[in-house]
UniProtKB/Swiss-Prot annotation:
Gene Ontology molecular functions: aminomethyltransferase activity; transaminase activity
The protein's name: Aminomethyltransferase
Organism: Listeria innocua serovar 6a (strain ATCC BAA-680 / CLIP 11262)
Record has Transferase as a keyword: yes
Subunit structure: The glycine cleavage system is composed of four proteins: P, T, L and H.
Lineage: Bacteria, Bacillati, Bacillota, Bacilli, Bacillales
Gene3D superfamilies hit by this protein: Aminomethyltransferase beta-barrel domains (3.30.70.1400), Aminomethyltransferase fragment (4.10.1250.10), Probable tRNA modification gtpase trme, domain 1 (3.30.1360.120)
Class of the enzyme per the UniProt entry, highest EC level: transferase
Family: Belongs to the GcvT family.
GO cellular component, one term: cytosol
Pfam families, sorted: GCV_T, GCV_T_C
Signal peptide start-end: none
Amino acid sequence: MTELLKTPIHPLYAKYGAKTIDFGGWDLPVQFAGIKAEHEAVRTDAGLFDVSHMGEILVEGPDSTSYLQYLLSNDIEKIKIGKAQYNIMCYETGGTVDDLVVYKKSETEYILVVNAANTEKDYEWMVQNIVGDVTVKNASSEFGQLALQGPNAEKILSKLTDADLSSISFFGFIEDADVAGVKTIISRSGYTGEDGFEIYMQSADAGKVFEAILAEGVAPIGLGARDTLRLEAVLALYGQELSKDITPLEAGLNFAVKLKKEADFIGKQALIKQKEAGLTRKLVGIELIERGIPRHDYPVFLNDKEIGVITSGTQSPTLGTNIGLALIDTAYTELDQELEVGIRNKKVKAKVVQTPFYKRAK
């Protein structure tokens, strides 16, 4: 049996009561105090996540921008220095290699933050598709990453840094910011639907920053609440809403797919064809009318005909309803369309609803 990978924060988990699980080969906390309490802490106050398992890939060199334009679906030329951008890396088929965030440090330096379980695959794909004068480095082991999320995130973080946090706009970042005596990159971003920050530092310093933030009375949050939070906000999870067989257009991520950008990118022609032909399946939000919780891979039916599959589902702690995302035949994606979800040998009534399920008050 392969030993599970551990983040630099791992030695501190037991101290804070973490219950860990195998998540894509990593030993990570699924919960601390409990999923519902943690979820509520992030929605109403603030919570701290150890996300040091995420991958960081550095791209440097004079042709960095044109290389990333070829590799990624969004328009890299639109990113200003000190800003980040959500992106999709596609196969020639239009299917998804990964979804990721690109940070622009300078005209010739970028950091790509990728999903942990995809880090090696992404790195190999990037090296295989190098064009021009660039170097690509998998620097994941050098970074620790924490996410402080929730309406009080700025107020709490400002106690530990002199950096002007209010000046950081959404998807903006600052470098060399001192947090609890540690040099960090602070980005206004996250995966919860709340305001918040993602903080990057050298892996050796991650534990110090983690404990300094928790000392401000912040709750540590596990993967369970991370999943319910992102699902309410309808933020895609690779392996569920996206995969090598699911294109970003099917997943409703058109905002990150710039088919009109001049640069040709890997998968562009396949995505243009798919758009012109019309999508045969689409991701929708569903809410159960009858009792039951939809889960990943449960089938979706209409009058005994299987029309799709649940990609993610949960009992929503914020709304108190049972919700899910489903990839279904486009013909049945109208709001209020009634469907059935196959939950253990039983068909349970559901309907198509507006997404996101949750949107924070600005």
